[in-house]
Amino acid sequence: MPQLVESCGIFFFCFILYCLCFSLPLQKIKIVIMRVLIVNTSERAGGAAVAANRLMDALNNNGVKAKMLVRDKVSDDITVVGVQRSLRSQWNFLWERWCIFWHLHFSRKNLFGIDIANIGFDITSLPEFKEADVIHLHWINQGMLSLKNIRKIINSGKPVVWTMHDMWPASSICHLTLGCHHYTNGC
């Protein structure tokens, strides 16, 4: 008989606990959704853009709110946001290319194989950046982000993930090293 009372007591306790847990109003349950901002120069052009789009789709289909911030927006996709390009930003891009062209002694051979990242957009003041929990950098060259902008993103305190689609993040100048290892001790 004492075992029956004890069993009934445990059952009653579990029943009360069950009722309390499942009778809570839904307004008191807060679900937090992670927000990821994927940053890439182009929305569609290049392998990095393809990878960034696939990642964004996978995240959005699995309970994460992901947006992509690009310099070159071509679609009307609402999850892709283009930075505001101005005449000045286009001039800055051309000026950076001219400096590289001059340094290469007017050879077009490696004009787009090198990036000095002197110019770019400050994305830290954008609402998409402020809302994001995680910043994921992809291919961010040719006027998307400068070295100064990258430092500002890192100093924002948000976690930063950087997918290296080429050697630029390691070499700080060349997209492809082509057997050259000068970046390891100075170029």
Model-derived features with residue positions:
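Hydrophobic alpha-helical signal peptides and transmembrane signal-/tail-anchor segments
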Residues: 9-25
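Secretory pathway export signals and precursors
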Residues: 4, 15-17, 176, 183
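Catalytic cores of nucleotide-sugar-dependent glycosyltransferases that transfer UDP/GDP/TDP-activated
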Residues: 34-187
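Glycine-centered signal
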Residues: 2, 23-26, 31
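Intrinsically disordered, low-complexity segments enriched in serine/proline and basic residues
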Residues: 1-10
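A generic alpha-helix propensity feature with a strong bias for hydrophobic helices
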Residues: 5-6, 28, 130, 162
